Amino acid sequence: MTRFPLRAALTAGVLWGSALAGSAHAQAPNDRYWFEAQAYWPDVDTRVSVAGPNGVVGTTIDLESDLDLTDRKTLPAFMAGARIGERWSLIGEYYGLDRGGSATTSREINFDDVTYSAGATLSSSFDTKVYRAAVGYAFLKSDKGELGASLGLHVTQFKLTLSGQGHVGNAAVQSELRKRDALAPLPTLGLYGAYQIAPRVLIGGRVDYLSLKVGDYDGRLVNTEARLSYRVLDNVAIGAAYRYVDYNLNIDKERWQGELAYKFKGPALFLQAVF
């Protein structure tokens, strides 16, 4: 393959991933190992429902609007990766988002068979921890860029609590606390690309996707990132990225029956060490 078609294919792949709002896989082609620390500032939107053991359908709750959880929070993210041979690579990633708050609800809410009347003061928390691992293969590769596919596992731990004055059925109003948690291990397929547009400047992008029923979960996951980095030293790079993550899941577990729609998107700054 000539240099020009390879460059065109790489550039098209990166732009396509970025257009989807499109990474730890986006490394310079000759980097063997890398570690990255990231400060991510997402805009968060969360909707949940939890049915009770008696089959009563739960209210769809907007955690930011109904329960006043913050919709903006800076969180750390950590990534590491290694190349195996010329075309294979392994990456791992972790980040978490913990939020809590208190609000007076403006409408009646049913959560796990508990009814909280309008005007009740509710305390809540929603914590998530995300672990991502993937193996990638670069099917197009040159000295300046690469385009590849990945197979990964996106594991998310969700913990939700809600407490306040409420009642179950016809029982008297009293303080009620409900907790729910779920662990969602979701396989993903992805595309990634990177291209060195100048001696120390790299652009890159990634998109991971899932849309199927896996065990107790049925729905969709989209996880994308686009980035630009500058190599300030031979082994140190700084950069900026934009990340978009969107879960839309129906959950059918003993500890959680209901729905979860969880979306966060926003910019990030990162510092990277390469070897």
Task: Provide a role label for each language-model segment.
Residues 25-97, 131, 268-274:
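Short glycine/proline- and aromatic-enriched beta-strand/turn motifs that initiate or cap beta-hairpins
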Residues 82-84, 137-139, 153, 193-195, ...:
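Residue-level signature of outer-membrane beta-barrel architecture
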Residues 79, 134-136, 190-192, 225-227, ...:
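Outer-membrane beta-barrel architecture
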Residues 1-32:
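Cleavable N-terminal export/targeting peptides
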